[in-house]
Amino acid sequence: MLHCITTIFLSISRMTMEDGPIAESYFTAYADVCFREFGNHVKFWTTINEANVFTIGGYNDGTSPPGRCSNCSSGNSSTETYIVGHNLLLAHASVSRLYQQKYKDKQGGSVGFSLYAFEFIPQTSSSKDDEIAIQRAKDFFYGWILGPLTFGDYPDEMKRAVGSRLPIFSKEESEQVKGSSDFIGIMHYFPALVENIKLKPSLSRNTDFYSDMGVSLTYLGNFSGFGYDVFPWAMESVLEYIKQTYGNPPVYILENGTPMKPDLELQQKDTRRIEYLQAYIGAVLKAVRNGSDTRGYFV
């Protein structure tokens, strides 16, 4: 039987996710329509697509909708990134609660949450500072989302670094968010080199997600648009980290793959992508054999 996973929220430019309660109520009402109209055909739902990089791109960097950042015409990278991430988690919990109460028994589906998953490796293999920085990067990219979904709160390191700019879950909100995702969806393409950075006091006021994290990232791979480099070990490592750190939740790989140069002969043979998929599916198989509860792979 063929199953599909349907994403409710892909990218919304007009819905201001920095306005928490209003956006949460609208999003829940929108999800209600989706469940009612399509729930008999869709058994796997993801509420938010790539929640971490969506928020960073839209509210820290300003490179994706709605294009807000400190250096943009409007926005504040030091606060809005965390406010929006917080509101996305609360909106997800509201939608998950709606499904559990109104549709779960009748439709028998599942509601999950997705994030972009990098594998992080040290810029300098002998650098202890870079090794420590890797954990900070994981706390910010993974723990920011999976911490509340698994434990009901943000990682301690993130709370220390961001301070009062990081929203606080009430006891009720923490209980609602914790355990609200039936599965975790991940998007993965390539790893990143991590270098520890120390900001000079004179620059410390220009805070954003990356300066709070205290790392510089260099993405590995060929980004020409005609094929990504192959790092299957990175996929295996990501799945192992999620297994060990967040209680081995059910995982679906929702995005992976590589583009191809528009060449008819290459497209007919497609050898590169066959080899790519063999390598990555093999890495997923290794992770599953090592205990990862990975249940699906999409390209």
UniProtKB/Swiss-Prot annotation:
Glycans are attached at residues 71, 76, 222, 290. It is an enzyme of class 3 (hydrolase). Pfam families: Glyco_hydro_1. The keyword S-adenosyl-L-methionine does not apply. A beta-D-glucoside binds at residues 49-50, 189, 255. Keywords: Disulfide bond, Glycoprotein, Glycosidase, Hydrolase, Signal. This is Putative beta-glucosidase 2. It comes from Arabidopsis thaliana. The gene is BGLU2.
